[in-house]
Structure formats: structure tokens, C-alpha cells
UniProtKB/Swiss-Prot annotation:
Belongs to the MurCDEF family. MurD2 subfamily. Its EC number is 6.3.2.53. This is UDP-N-acetylmuramoyl-L-alanine--L-glutamate ligase. It comes from Salinispora tropica (strain ATCC BAA-916 / DSM 44818 / JCM 13857 / NBRC 105044 / CNB-440). Pathway: Cell wall biogenesis; peptidoglycan biosynthesis.
Length: 448
């Protein structure tokens, strides 16, 4: 379904955040017979609905909103509307077509788009792809989940999008190059279960992309994709890390060395994998990666890591404090822990409790000497899951500030204090930015 298909139709836009606002502006320009906006009360942070928005799409709330959705020819939902929402189940029962702004946009722009998703690494990888393309004279527009809604993007010859599982779920067109960085259970409450989450995430690949690029080291991706023909970044046939001319790790394309691993300023093997995926995407887009390796090395060296993703905080004590507040699952926390392998490490875990299974984290730490400090709400349950591991020291504190204070006392000189919560921020904090702010302030307040 394209935007132009909405001409003369009764359309309801469900959600009044930035995606809903972009949808109203775009749809209004295509002459729907009727256009309304529906707010189900699930968000309290949307700014006022006034001016052009109120004129083009009057706002309806409560039970009246549910009725307007059911009466529409097409419903355009915001990504924040979960698949488990009871109103959505009723729309599906009535066979009311439901789509999203990203799906409408993709129908017109798929052939010019690189779409990146993944349970972890999609923001960094999509940012790297856009950054490296620009460095080799391939101008592009970057947006999606990480930035500007797709329906607000300007005209361009090439787009790079970060796409969430929610945005992927309603796609009926795949981008020219579909990219998946990692796959593990996430957002299960919104998708209805693990299988449903994988289905929605991998819907990015379901509609005939020209090329699929994946992290070839991810076992779940390998299992889900089977023998499907894909480019498996991180394997010897394509972009990967191996010993280089000087004996240190280098990025390679096949058997050809590109530049040293040390050029990449981001820590962790998972970030090596993210860059391998990005370089593989450039390769399939026709960039002569080998010929442009010097230019790419300079661009990689200048890449600034994204906030709240293994962001190191300077501290006069000699300890390294690390903000990885966006690690909202045990698998993401495991990647962060691995990034500081070989250093004395204290990790702070806990947040909103979604009932996740922390057995994988326990297995990962079975032979690791580490201190784990739990904070509400799920911190005590995570710590309990680690009970009995001989090399893991565990504590539980009442809040994040107390956890930082304790971490200072128990972490050896030169060690790392890592906030990698393995849980979302809501409940104790307004959002992940607020959790990050509280952590950084606690580091400052407890210094000296």
C-alpha cells in the first residue's frame, strides 16, 4: 500500500507522537475522504494536537477513538502501538487494513533504501553505513527509528534507515539491501512471544530484497535463515577480522587486509561485527572497498560512538565508568561484559522486570570473576539467578546512586564499573536518558 492509495479513503492515524504527526501531514496531502487522529491514552508525553494537525485530522480519544479505528478503511498505527493491544486484535478480527508510516514510505522508496534492524547493533551499524557511504562520495539520507520519521525524510537517491521490530512488522516491501545485525529475544511483551518477535523482526527480509546482509557470527540468525542466500559478514569469504600484515588484528575483505582493528575507536567484539556488516553493505552497493580502504580507515577512525552505548565517563579515581543504559536484555549485557574482558569488572544490572529468563547470563558468567550489583526492580531477581557461581560476587542495593557508591568501594584500581542493566528503564526512571543522567550524576557526586 502506497500513500497515493489513501486518496478518497477513510483513514485513521493511531498515535500522536512524532510518527503519528508525520503520518497526518503526509496523508493529508494525498486527499483522503476522511482523516482522524486517535489517541488511546497510552502516552502522556505527546505535545498539544493543534494548528494544522487539528484541522487536518481531528483528535478522538477513549472509546470513541476505538470506534473510529473500526470504522476506517485503513488504519495507520504508530510503531509504539504493540501487537498485543486489544484494539489491534479487534481490527484484525474485522479485517481492517492496518499499516504504518514506514510501510507506506517503503512502498515508494524500497529500491533506494538500505534497511537495518537487529536486536542489538542496529543503531551503530546503520550510523556507520551512512557515515562511510558519505566518506566515499555516496551522499545519503539517514533516518528511521534513530532519527527522523521516514515520512519526514527529504528526497534522495539513497537512504539508510534504522528500523525497529515494530516498524518491520507491517512492511509489505523489503528495502533493496536488508540488514540484520543480531537476533535474540527482546520486546516479547509487545510482540506476544519469542516466535512472534522473530517473525516481526525478520519481516524486513520477507518481501524480495535484492540483497540480505547479516552478522554471520550470530547463531540465531543462522538458525532462522537456514540455507537462504545471504552475505554473512564476519566470515572469511567477506568482511572479517583476522591477523594482519603486522601481526595484529586487521579488518579484511576476503583475503585482502583493509586496515588495523585499532583504527575503530569502539570497544568490543560486537562492534567489530557491526563494522564488518557495514563494510559488507558498502561492498554489495558497489563501493570498491579495497581501493577506498585508506579513505574508509580515516572515516572509521573519526566515527563517534553513539550515546548510552558503552560510553566511557572520565573519572579522577582511575576507574572507568561506562554508560551502556541501552543494554535492555541479558544478551546485550553479555556483549558489554565481553567488551571489557581481561579487566576487573563490576556490572550494575536491573530495571523494569519483564520476566526475562536470565539463565543465558548465568551461563555466560559461569567461569568469570566479576562483581554484579542489582538495582530495582529486577536486580534482585537477576542476582538470584547468579546464585552459586563461585567467581561471581553479588550485592543488591536500593537504587542506582547507592549502586555507584558501592561499586567504587569494591572495584579494584584500574577496573571498570559498567552500567549494563539487562532491563528497560521505565518504572524507576522516565526513560533511558533519565537513567543515564542519574548514573552520570552519581559518578560525579561520589568522586573524590
Amino acid at each position: 500500500m502506497r500513500l497515493s492509495d489513501l486518496r478518497g479513503r477513510k483513514v485513521a492515524v493511531w498515535g500522536t507522537g512524532r510518527e503519528g504527526r508525520a503520518a497526518v501531514v503526509a496523508i493529508a496531502a494525498h486527499g483522503p475522504a476522511d482523516l482522524v487522529a486517535v489517541d488511546d491514552g497510552g502516552s502522556t508525553v505527546s505535545p498539544p494536537w493543534d494548528g494544522f494537525l487539528a484541522t487536518a485530522a481531528p483528535l478522538v480519544t477513549g472509546d470513541a477513538g476505538a470506534q473510529r479505528l473500526a470504522a476506517a478503511d485503513v488504519v495507520v498505527r504508530s510503531p509504539g502501538v504493540p501487537n498485543t493491544h486489544p484494539w489491534l486484535a479487534e481490527l484484525w478480527r474485522r479485517q481492517v487494513p492496518v499499516t504504518q508510516g514506514t510501510a507506506l514510505w517503503m512502498a515508494d522508496h524500497a529500491a533506494r533504501t538500505v534497511g537495518v534492524t537487529g536486536s542489538k547493533g542496529k543503531s551503530t551499524t546503520s550510523s556507520l553505513i551512512s557515515h562511510l557511504l558519505a566518506a566515499v562520495d555516496q551522499p545519503n539520507v539517514f533516518g528511521g527509528n534513530i532519527g527522523v520519521p521516514t515520512l519526514d525524510l527529504p528526497a534522495a537517491d539513497l537512504y539508510v534507515l534504522e528500523l525497529s521490530s515494530y516498524q518491520c512488522s507491517d512492511l509489505t516491501d523489503s528495502p533493496r539491501v536488508a540488514v540484520v545485525t543480531a537476533l535474540f529475544p527482546e520486546h516479547l511483551d509487545a510482540h506476544g512471544g519469542e516466535r512472534e518477535y522473530y517473525r516481526d523482526k525478520l519481516n524486513l527480509l520477507a518481501h524480495g530484497p535484492e540483497t540480505v546482509v547479516v552478522n554471520g557470527a550470530d547463531p540465531r540468525l543462522a538458525a532462522e535463515l537456514g540455507d537462504r542466500p545471504v552475505v554473512r559478514a564476519g566470515t572469511p569469504d567477506t568482511t572479517h577480522v583476522a591477523g594482519g600484515p603486522d601481526g595484529t588484528p586487521w579488518f579484511h575483505l576476503g583475503d585482502q587486509p583493509l586496515f588495523p582493528r585499532a583504527v575503530l575507536p569502539l570497544v568490543g567484539r560486537h562492534n567489530e561485527g557491526n563494522l564488518c556488516v557495514a563494510l559488507a553493505v558498502l561492498d554489495v552497493l558497489g563501493v570498491d572497498v579495497l581501493a577506498r580502504r585508506d579513505t574508509l580507515a580515516v572515516a572509521v577512525a573519526g566515527f563517534q560512538g553513539l550515546a548510552h552505548r558503552l560510553t566511557e565517563i572520565v573519572d579522577p579515581s582511575g576507574l572507568t565508568f561506562v554508560d551502556d543504559t541501552l543494554a535492555t536484555s541479558p544478551y546485550a549485557a553479555m556483549h558489554a561484559i565481553d567488551a571489557y574482558d581481561g579487566r576487573a569488572l563490576t556490572v550494575i544490572v536491573g530495571g523494569a522486570d519483564r520476566g526475562l529468563d536470565y539463565t543465558p547470563l548465568r551461563d555466560h558468567l559461569a567461569e568469570r570473576e566479576i562483581t554484579v550489583i542489582g538495582v530495582p526492580d529486577s536486580g534482585a531477581r537477576i542476582v538470584a539467578a547468579l546464585d552459586g557461581l563461585p567467581k561471581v560476587r553479588c550485592d543488591v542495593t536500593g537504587d542506582l546512586v547507592e549502586a555507584v557508591r558501592l561499586a567504587r568501594r569494591v572495584t579494584p584500581a584500574g577496573g571498570v564499573v559498567l552500567l549494563s542493566p539487562a532491563a528497560p528503564s521505565y518504572g524507576q526512571f522516565r526513560n533511558f536518558e533519565h537513567r543515564s543522567e542519574v548514573f552520570a550524576q552519581a559518578v560525579r557526586d561520589t568522586a573524590g
